[in-house]
Amino acid sequence: MPLTLAVYGKGGIGKSTTSCNISAALAKRGKKVLQIGCDPKHDSTFTLTGFLIPTIIDTLQEKDFHYEDIWPEDVIYDGYGGVKCVEAGGPPAGAGCGGYVVGETVKLLKELNAFDEFDVILFDVLGDVVCGGFAAPLNYADYCIIVTDNGFDALFAANRIAASVREKARTHPLRLAGLIGNRTSKRDLINKYVDHVPMPVLEVLPLIEDIRVSRVKGQTLFEMADKDPMLSYVCDYYLNIADQILAKPEGVIPKESADRELFTLLSDFYLNADKPKVNAEEELDLMMV
């Protein structure tokens, strides 16, 4: 059975870029990897392929939903380093359920026996939406990975995703592998959160402009490093993540914080972060002046 990962995180946090570079890192470690984009924008695999590949839902519509008329090469495309790529797609804007499309994608790939040939399957899932449909990849995953930054909103979203992992772990052998901090110059708020809600931190990537450029170019950092070896140090971050995942860590079943409690914890940290610490004796001296 392939090792299956589900990557979640706040919308716009760099989740797809992170997913593509992790997939490339896993391929560099000799693994056969399938990345499945689960977002109606169907741009999850752009960094691997360099173009927006046709979606499964588009292909199904072309075939009048006759699954028997679809072959693996109709929906699976080649990406950098031999990573295979699939985009689920979605319904027209404002109509239908994107989560339903994720289910149809898994159904089709199973009928094609597409999962059997891979060592690792990575689901890159839409934003921080954790409704039943978009939480569906957690039903198939061995591990969930949450991409965040050092900000309030991303960690608040991470906490909600952690709650989904805990709920799914009741009935599935699912664990949270940990957090990845993406393009952040600090990690103090991440540390504050994981002290409050214990979970591993797999890696924290610094504020490196080439990570953003990777997305815009439609190239992984590994492909960019093939042309500019000075970027090899950035690839090492993703290789470190890949090595941890391939080691099959124990992971955790997280116990998320209550929303109001987390809101208070994180907002207090922001509001008081720059205030100097004053001990009781100093405070008394100030009062007597």
Curated annotation (Swiss-Prot):
UniProt-listed SUPFAM superfamilies: P-loop containing nucleoside triphosphate hydrolases
Pathway(s) the chain acts in: Porphyrin-containing compound metabolism; chlorophyll biosynthesis (light-independent)
Binding site for Mg(2+): S16
Family the entry assigns: Belongs to the NifH/BchL/ChlL family.
Keyword set, alphabetical order: 4Fe-4S, ATP-binding, Chlorophyll biosynthesis, Iron, Iron-sulfur, Magnesium, Metal-binding, Nucleotide-binding, Oxidoreductase, Photosynthesis
Name by which UniProt lists this protein: Light-independent protochlorophyllide reductase iron-sulfur ATP-binding protein
Catalyzed reaction equations: chlorophyllide a + oxidized 2[4Fe-4S]-[ferredoxin] + 2 ADP + 2 phosphate = protochlorophyllide a + reduced 2[4Fe-4S]-[ferredoxin] + 2 ATP + 2 H2O
Free-text comment on the cofactor: Binds 1 [4Fe-4S] cluster per dimer.
A matching Pfam family: Fer4_NifH
Binding site for ATP: G12, I13, G14, K15, S16, T17, K41, N182, R183
Described purpose of this protein according to its UniProt entry: Component of the dark-operative protochlorophyllide reductase (DPOR) that uses Mg-ATP and reduced ferredoxin to reduce ring D of protochlorophyllide (Pchlide) to form chlorophyllide a (Chlide). This reaction is light-independent. The L component serves as a unique electron donor to the NB-component of the complex, and binds Mg-ATP.
CDD domains the UniProt entry points to: Bchl-like (cd02032)
Chain residues that bind [4Fe-4S] cluster: C97, C131
Domain of life, per lineage: Bacteria
The protein's Enzyme Commission number: 1.3.7.7
